[in-house]
């Protein structure tokens, strides 16, 4: 059986509609309003079965929000409300969100060649090939760099070989994504952690930090902080009246098909409303959606070993 180390997940138990204004927890302290499952007509035995399933699969923590309020919150083993845990590739969506902020502040444009920020020769491609790689290509996994050439996480120039013209091939490739961290830093003049703290962390009351591990820059936080970011996504970049991501066109693009090669991928965000999708580390096009049992409108930040933030806007989940 696959072992999950699930850091956070929005899960739908029913399509029962309980619409009301979104609630936002205070930016400081531990207070967070709750909503009883019984108020939503959810079955207690199914919740017990869910917790048993999560526990048997090595889950660390699980939170479900409805209208911004906590309906379910469960920690397993030694994991607690104050425990930090890695987001894995779910952190990609957080990075995409910050790229949007950097663009709205005129620090960069998605159509810019990445070389403007990473310097000439950041790849092992020819100058002409390299110049065609843009920030948008990094956001959409369409850099054209060879993801099967050695270590796919390696960000050293000699690891980044040409395989196809930028925009012509989709491949889940960590290295070009990771280099967006340097793009943000060079464009804004701030370290990635400092930019995150100023633009996202403090405005919504998160904790968390990026931490370099080998070639990867991995984000860590508590489950509740992950929930805060999920709530920010649910409200399209607005936190309790504070419009953090003002570029709504960017938010729409981030949570919509970004290219036709893999329609289930936006800007470092997975989409469930498509009839075909490609999976990481494969060139096979699969029929169906990434999560056929979930509502088609769901979009998700997804990381290995079950690090998920799933958003269903019509249900305020």
Regions inferred by a protein language model and the residue ranges of each:
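Bacterial Sec-dependent N-terminal signal peptides
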Residues: 1-21
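N-terminal pre-domain segments of enzymes
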Residues: 21-40
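A short, well-structured edge-of-sheet supersecondary motif
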Residues: 50-79, 309-310, 316
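Active-site SXXK
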Residues: 68, 85-111, 138, 180-184, ...
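Active-site helix/loop module of the DD-peptidase/beta-lactamase fold
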Residues: 105-143, 190-222
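A small/polar active-site loop signature that marks catalytic segments
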Residues: 140-212, 216
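Penicillin-binding protein/beta-lactamase superfamily catalytic region
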Residues: 164, 194, 205-313
